[in-house]
Amino acid sequence: MGFELDRFDGEVDPDLKCALCHKVLEDPLTTPCGHVFCAGCVLPWVVQEGSCPSRCRGRLSAKELNHVLPLKRLILKLDIKCAHAARGCGRVVKLQDLPEHLERCDFAPARCRHAGCGQLLLRRDVEAHMRDACDARPVGRCQEGCGLPLTHGEQRAGGHCCARALRAHNGALQARLGALHKALKKEALRAGKREKSLLAQLAAAQLELQMTALRYQKKFTEYSARLDSLSRCVAAPPGGGEETKSLTLVLHRDSGSLGFNIIGGRPCVDNQDGSSSEGIFVSKIVDSGPAAKEGGLQIHDRIIEVNGKDLSRATHDQAVEAFKTAKEPIVVQVLRRTPRTKMFTPASESQLVDTGTQTDITFEHIMALTKISSPSPPVLGPYLLPEEHPSSHEYYDPNDYMGDIHQDMDREELELEEVGLYRMNSQDKLGLTVCYRTDDEDDIGIYISEIDPNSIAAKDGRIREGDRIIQINGIEVQNREEAVALLTSEENKNFSLLIARPELQLDEGWMDDDRNDFLDDLHMDMLEEQHHQAMQFTASVLQQKKHEEDGGTTDTATILSNQHEKDSGVGRTDESTRNDESSEQENNGEDATASSNPLAGQRKLTCSQDTLGSGDLPFSNESFISADCTDVDYLGIPEDECERFRELLELKCQVQSTSPYSLYYPSSPLDAAGKGDPESVDKELELLNEELRSIELECLSIVRAHKMQQLKEQYRESWMLHHSGFRNYNTSVDVRRHELSDITELPEKSDKDSSSAYNTGESCRSTPLTLEISPDNSLRRVAEGSSEGATANMEAYRPSPKNLLAITEDPEVSTPNYNPGAKELDPSQALEIKERRVSDGSRSPTASPKLGSAYLPSYHHSPYKHAHIPAHAQHYQSYMHLIQQKSAVEYAQSQMSLVSMCKDLNSSNSAEPRMEWKVKIRSDGTRYITKRPVRDRLLRERALKIREERSGLTTDDDAMSEMKMGRYWSKEERKQHLVKAKEQRRRREFMMQSRLDCLKEQQASDDRKEMNILELSHKKMMKKRNKKIFDNWMTIQELLTHGTKSPDGTRVYNSFLSVTTV
């Protein structure tokens, strides 16, 4: 509606008037025909009539009306009187300023704000009325007891009735409460309707999203299947882990259907480009259909022909038409991919040399590895191998090999393959059983342990047991939860798996077929080797005695080149340490040794890594049995025993003389059994068993004789030191005799199947699988008990980055190497160094190869005896560790008597002088000898404890442990692990609760006792007891004081202490 005309000051232009209300236009709107009306007048008209009020045209809607802004601004500038002019306001303002004036006009009507008054007044009079004239204004409170406020009218009337006033007040409050409840119900109803509306919208959006996702998932699945098939057929290089074979199948229609779908085909008929490799592929097979029967089609098969019609370059429509018009029986020729069988690779591709540390080789390790030989000399020929696996082992010059060693080490040892699996519905199973670690290790690998024969994965044929899953559907698998979630997802029907496997992985069938034959042959050969090595040790001892009588000196500088370091309990921690300390002197010693003995240069052999990475050892045709050396009572060995050994050795030599390769390959008794009488085999087995018992008796005799000899040598050494100082004299006898103390090794537990050792930073210079050990410790005694010439030349065998494979040995025992310029080593120093080397055992990086390689014939290390061990398995520590354990059980019982003697010998060696001689190195590389205090008894006991706890495992063993390299635990074993873990957790909780209760009792009994430093540190230790490492503030004194003690003083917690002496 418009503004009244009489409110405006002056005349108003008629064009500014509305034709409907005849007032001044308010919010003018114009019609398409050009007429202008007030918005409040024309909108109801148009909605009701549907035409212009002037009747000038046909139909009209409200959407066709438009605002006239220039006309509106013109009207707003007109002068108008105040709306309260009748009440006395005489203001005249612009129409656009009228709302602002009305808000503060003094003549606007307003009511009194006192309850019960409600009188209508002018805005300017309201304040005065409420203050002075209103009868409802409060003047105080009732003093009669109700406490309600009194109004001016009630006070003027003489008071009020308290009961009536309280009833009125209560009624007012109840009315207000009812109004609030009603408003609350309205708001709740309004909120409920709004919530339902929002939920309906959200459900509709989710439904639409699901439908869209299903549509795109279906398209994506189809496109992915097609892309996978095309990429495998077109882009895949030949020989990439698979091979294709052609099959001819016969199909019969069932109710007019063949039961499979096809995809692919040439894009168009006109495209005759020969380079196009598009083909027809099977994308889906209906369950229980004709194509799904045994011997039928499989997914990803490429169809080549149908009833003689070539479909290799046909379009999709042509392929469909060919199947529709084909007459039964339908003969289909397809191409199917199958996994390529891994064959042997040349030795040049697999000859790798790793570096690592070998520690604590005990008798059980030695006896366990008697069934594992070392590489053979370069006399090639088949030996105990089937014809389908030819033996081709090439040998190269060490210098040529070392030139490419780094490239070989950088070569990738795993091959990756992407496998796509498609399932028809969510109920279909992939058929994969995975295994993983169950402890708190961060690096958890997911491996395939089992494949269901009738599953999708088995039909695909590209996934094998032992493969590691790297990615699933493009997502890198970090832990077992992600792998399980991705593999068990019901939404995905298409799975893309990126798997990894070793390049040299072989089929297990070959190993299973020939394993028993190999083990039988190897067992017989190892028994013979034990006899040979025992006889060599006996002969070397006799020959050494003779050499001592002849007199000779040893180059102590050469002997000590590898012995100048103090035993730290953990071995060297870096390869650079070894290079910095002893590279120059050792190289010079090697050159001098090689030049002084022409035979040594002719016997330089190389190593082959295809059998456990062990190095070849020099072979000498010289006889170790000398008829001249008849003083067999030197170490308490009876003469009849020695004669029996000689007879047995002659018998073995006669047996081996029948083989054309007898110099390098000892003949197997089983081969002889095939040609001769089986009774001779049984007789020889009895002789070999008697040999083992004789060897054990020999070791016990050596121990007893060594104890007696050691006492004599100690007195003689002290006398010679007192009288002759550092003058040159024969030290080779003392050095050799004290090297017999290697029999003092500690026993090792046979159930060591843990996957890691203490990570104390041991060096990594030898392959973890390279164990240069013999059936018993006599092998090491042969190396140390030999003449000084061989000992001095043993420096050439010490592995170095520049000469890992070259071996320079001088087996001559009649020509001692004498260096008059070098400082001689006195007996006490030689004793101490030898004892340190022996106490360090095979923990020293160079102890095992050096001590075990002096006179062992190289034909004892034929790689063909290990044919039952796959080439790829030689890189896995867990595989070899299991083989060692299996072999160790067979010899564990026979070695217990030796172990007990070792403990006695260790106790006898504990009484050492308080001073010892040390070999130091100057800045120019020369060595000198000085006196240093002996380490404290506590440190020695701790070192022995560390040696027991390490038990032959190294940091390399930890890096290549069973779990990380994929040992597969069965379900029963995993259940046992869980039970053990729960039991340990329960014990830890019980111990924790016991300790807390004890601490609470102590605090309650002695609240005001001031805690000393020991109690504080002990409390800190208790918090850390379940952790494998300690914090940065833990001191050795705290560990030694109470590191393994409970609050009551008893030894309860088994915390390990690893100390490195620098």
From Swiss-Prot:
The keyword Ubl conjugation applies. Residues 544-602, 744-798, 811-830 are annotated as: Disordered. GO terms for molecular function: ubiquitin protein ligase activity; ubiquitin-protein transferase activity; zinc ion binding. Keywords: Coiled coil, Cytoplasm, Metal-binding, Phosphoprotein, Repeat, Synapse, Transferase, Ubl conjugation, Ubl conjugation pathway, Zinc, Zinc-finger. Residues 679-704, 812-1062 form a coiled coil. Interacts with NLGN1 and EFNB2. Interacts with UBE2D2 and with MUSK via the first PDZ domain. It catalyses: S-ubiquitinyl-[E2 ubiquitin-conjugating enzyme]-L-cysteine + [acceptor protein]-L-lysine = [E2 ubiquitin-conjugating enzyme]-L-cysteine + N(6)-ubiquitinyl-[acceptor protein]-L-lysine. The modification Phosphoserine is found at residue 426. This is E3 ubiquitin-protein ligase PDZRN3. A zinc finger (TRAF-type) spans 100-158.
